[in-house]
Amino acid sequence: MTKKIRAIGAVVVVGIWLLIVAVAWFSSDEVYSFTERSYLDPFPELTLENIMEKDDASRGTQSFMTEFNAYTLDQFPMRDGFRQIKAMFHLYALQQSNNNGKYIHDGYMTEMTPLNEEVFQKNLESIQRIYEKYLENAENCNVYMAVVPDKNYFLAEPSGHDAMSMDYGQFFADVQANTPWANHIDLLDVLDISDYYRTDTHWRQENIVDVAQKLANAMGAEGPKTEDFTVQKLEDTFYGVYYGQIAVPVAGEDLFLLRSDVLDECLVSYDGAPAVEGVYDWDRSKVELEAKPNGGYNVYGDMYEVFLSKESGLIVIENPNATTDKELVVFRDSFGRSLIPLLVQDYAKITVIDTRWITGGTHMLDRFVNFENKDVLLLYSTTVLNSVELK
């Protein structure tokens, strides 16, 4: 009986192995992983030269076997399914509190955020340099600052992850202490966890009209009202960045955006390119891999990019329906992409700056932006201030 069971087990194992080999052999290679938001390695070119090649980091070369190993990992059959099994085993079977620093609480995916003191201080210094170079002596320049809390601010304590997260109160206090020249706008009283996507880092545009109104009021403007907009739901289902990182199978969510005649008629220029009409990039409102006529692909993998399109260092939004000549300059990260359109109705022109994407850094900003007689808003999330070095 024991021999029979062993024989059956061996047949099952061999059968599974043959099935995986067959699927791997006959399936076409994937170009891009939408769950991981990354390109997948193709089969490496097989030549005598790269067979003999050794890994050499100084020359940026890899051996055939190194490239082949990366290819097999990326193109492994049912890769996403095995990633999900692994994640569920760690979180549910082993009862681990997180998966690589990411966790789920009350249906919301987020990550632990210990303080990165070095990056945080460098970013405060970068903001100070911008102030001293462009804002301090600019005539009639009104400077404001607001910090957007990440989801862990709301979830760390109830989920039991507060000991492994930074002291948010101290973080906000340090920002204010290092930027005494700015008029600080506290957003904590108009935000809660329901204002954020469940599977992504960002906030939901349809839920932050009150945030935009508080910012506008603090800057002396009337601000938007909910009735100024109609809500439009995008057709495709939205899966945020945490969906692929945590790898636990959960339902996607709807992505809504706010429409108005004012927003539809705005003229938007990205990095000096000719202006286009409207603040939304409808090509990016879907999830697909689009082949280019001359080879390669256009990847539309993050539906959040519908807001002010792709990452750009300098975006100019002109409002032809403005009843004022006031102008606003916003230094921002990706959170600003969905919020800034809500401020358009109170300004004739909004210049949007993301210093991370400006070629050559910020030392020549005054060639493109005049800061005199402007409202200037520094709008950064705790995520970026704590993890990504600003230029």
Language model: regions and residue ranges:
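Extracellular glycan-modifying ectodomains
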Residues: M1-K391
